[in-house]
């Protein structure tokens, strides 16, 4: 990635952005950051060993329709954009950065007039996204209510990817399909090839 100081990796939830970005950052000797850590928005609506689903997160997914969930998350990403842009500008002339997150919306990234940057979006077939989200949410052991929340998150994630792919294909940035069985190393190689 000659000359590139910031590699941005976008994509919907559970496409492997964090894992691939971590591997890529290690390979390049760059810092790895996630846009998810810049501000809070109702995230994944399933229990983990460390936490229960907060009431406001459950309410968010229970009460909003899929299009409203999309509008909500895109509005959140729009509010977050100035911080993302500042981070990209700072690292474009300084220490290298691999920045990943769903907040890297193609239409906003396309407006960046910052040298030494590259952007790639990860995509996956709906079956892959579904399997990964259901595995993360322990769907098979979940209650009916927990499955409902996971299904809403899945529907939002699939819709997000559909809109994102339309934007990426229209604007021309690169995208990499993570496939069903591609290794992290293979996806990282493909991202590097697209970012060069």
Could you say what each language-model-derived stretch is?
Residues 17:
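Conserved lysine of the Walker
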Residues 20:
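Hydrophobic positions on the alpha1 helix immediately C-terminal to the Walker A/P-loop
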Residues 162-196:
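NTP-dependent small-molecule kinase module
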Residues 41-96, 103:
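ATP-dependent small-molecule kinase phosphotransfer cores
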Residues 28-46:
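Short beta-strand-centered segment that lines the nucleotide-binding/catalytic pocket of NTP-utilizing
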Residues 9:
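Hydrophobic anchor at the beta1->P-loop junction of P-loop NTPases
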Residues 12:
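P-loop (Walker A) phosphate-binding loop of NTP-binding proteins
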Residues 116-161:
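A glycine- and Lys/Arg-enriched "phosphate-lid" helix/loop adjacent to the NTP-binding pocket
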């Amino acid at each position: 990635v000659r000359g590139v100081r910031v590699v941005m990796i976008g994509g919907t939830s559970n496409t492997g952005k964090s894992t691939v970005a971590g591997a890529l950052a290690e390979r390049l000797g760059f810092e790895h950051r996630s846009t998810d850590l810049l501000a809070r928005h109702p995230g994944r609506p399933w229990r983990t060993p460390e936490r229960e689903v907060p009431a406001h997160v459950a309410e968010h997914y229970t009460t909003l329709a899929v299009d409203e969930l999309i509008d909500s998350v895109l509005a959140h990403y729009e509010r977050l954009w100035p911080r993302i842009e500042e981070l990209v500008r700072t690292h474009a002339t300084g220490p290298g950065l691999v920045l990943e997150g769903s907040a890297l919306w193609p239409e906003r990234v396309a407006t960046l007039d910052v040298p030494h940057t590259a952007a790639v979006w990860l995509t996956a077939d709906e079956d892959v996204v579904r399997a990964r989200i259901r595995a993360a949410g322990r769907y098979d052991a979940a209650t009916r209510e927990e499955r409902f929340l996971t299904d809403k998150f899945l529907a939002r994630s699939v819709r997000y990817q559909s809109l994102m792919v339309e934007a990426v294909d229209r604007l021309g940035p690169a995208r990499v399909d993570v496939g069903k069985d591609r290794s992290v190393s293979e996806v990282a190689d493909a991202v590097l090839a697209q970012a060069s």
